Amino acid sequence: MASFATHLVVVVTMLFVAMASAEMLQDVCVADLSNAVKVNGYTCKDSTQITPEDFYFKGLANIAATNTSTGSVVTGANVEKLPGLNTLGLSMSRIDYAPNGLNPPHVHPRASEIIFVLEGQLYVGFVTTAGKLIAKNLNKGDVFTFPKGLIHFQKNIANSPASVLAAFDSQLPGTQSLVASLFGALPDDILAKSFQLKHKQVKKIKLRYAPKK
């Protein structure tokens, strides 16, 4: 059985082949996460202060607890967790699913995504701007890609856990969950009109999604 390390190599290799690399003006630009100033990203850390830890992250090695309301957990390895990714235009994440768990419809506004199934069976798909659903059942070892900015999802269709590794062509892809974003931010009347719901129905749904501060 292929090792976890082998799976990581496969996903990273796929990403490097697919992505268009940006031209850098220095060897590295480790993100200075302590600097509040941002110009389309993080400023560079003093090169004399760079350490191996800036390029290292072990958070994808373990299965995350999936006892959430949707039955899925995303563990990200982006520039905020791995400062050495700054300006490199790539990142990864691991998604773990409980039996029948769902990674709800969401978008990544700044990146395309490619996933590699570590374990389990998934039903995954995305929706085009023309409203067409592109979806497929996946098994262990399968690969699927989601174009930048399009609504997509993954659902575990088995009665056993599932896991995937995902790679992105951005060091900070961003994630916007549709339901949480809409019902956590928009006014009641906008939601009621858009979804043809009664105001009391909107209020009931909004109780689950606290607005962002």
From Swiss-Prot:
Question: What's this protein's function?
Answer: May play a role in plant defense. Probably has no oxalate oxidase activity even if the active site is conserved.
- What name goes with this protein? Probable germin-like protein subfamily 2 member 5
| Family recorded in the similarity comment | Belongs to the germin family.
CDD domains attached to this UniProt entry: cupin_OxOx
Q: Residues that bind Mn(2+), according to the entry?
A: 106, 108, 113, 152
**Which PROSITE patterns does the protein's record reference?**
GERMIN
Cellular location of this protein? Answer: Secreted, Extracellular space, Apoplast
